Amino acid sequence: MSLIETHHLSYLPESHPVHVALYRDLQNASFLREQLLAGNTEFEYAFIDASMIFSRNHIFAAIFRAVRDYINNRLKSKNVHSEIVFSLGGSNNIADAFRRFGISESTRDLLVVKVSTAPEITHESVSKHLEHNIKALPCPFTEESLASMTDRARLRKVYKFGSVGADTFKRLDEVEQGKNGSETTKEAARKHIDMLLMGAIAIRGAT
């Protein structure tokens, strides 16, 4: 069983819907990584370590950039799915992006993205393939699920937001621990972090 979501992103062609699924307690990370390294086209997905994803907006920003670059023949990596992982990196170092955001043998929570680049890639075909090949517990692709998986300390370190970002992460941690603030403070902090992450993705390669 998979709880796959299919989305048509604004400002992108209807012919390229995006399929997203989230899993917990992954048991076959090594197998999935081997398929990617072997170039097995049946496993052409963006396999992302969910501990490095802050929110739905975070991953959708990377997907949007990758699909847009795919449509405009501006890919810097092998295909649109590797480009999604690359886009998350916020820099022009492809190897670093895969090391930080891609699936590894130690990945336990997995976010899977598949872009329909051909008519035969459908919600049903992706769902069936994932159901047969992902050994993990499917879970809803929600903000709550992602928040329970995110390694905020590592995310802060990778994106290097400086004191402003560090203060916002600290404020969010304090609210969730019941030390300070309110639900409004929490939402404001999450929105600010989202903006920082989406900005990093949008300007990748500009400097």
Curated annotation (Swiss-Prot):
The answer to whether keyword Nucleus applies is yes
Give yes or no: UniProt keyword Transcription regulation.
Answer: yes
By sequence similarity, the record places it as follows: Belongs to the CGI121/TPRKB family.
Q: Where does this one sit in the cell?
A: Nucleus; Chromosome, Telomere
Q: Name one Pfam family in it.
A: CGI-121
What is the predominant subcellular site recorded for this chain? nucleus
For this protein's source organism, the top of the classification is: Eukaryota, Fungi, Dikarya, Ascomycota, Pezizomycotina
Q: Could you tell me the gene encoding this protein? A: CGI121
Name the UniProt record assigns to this protein: EKC/KEOPS complex subunit CGI121
Q: Biological process GO terms, please?
A: tRNA threonylcarbamoyladenosine modification
Look up the domain of life of the source. Eukaryota
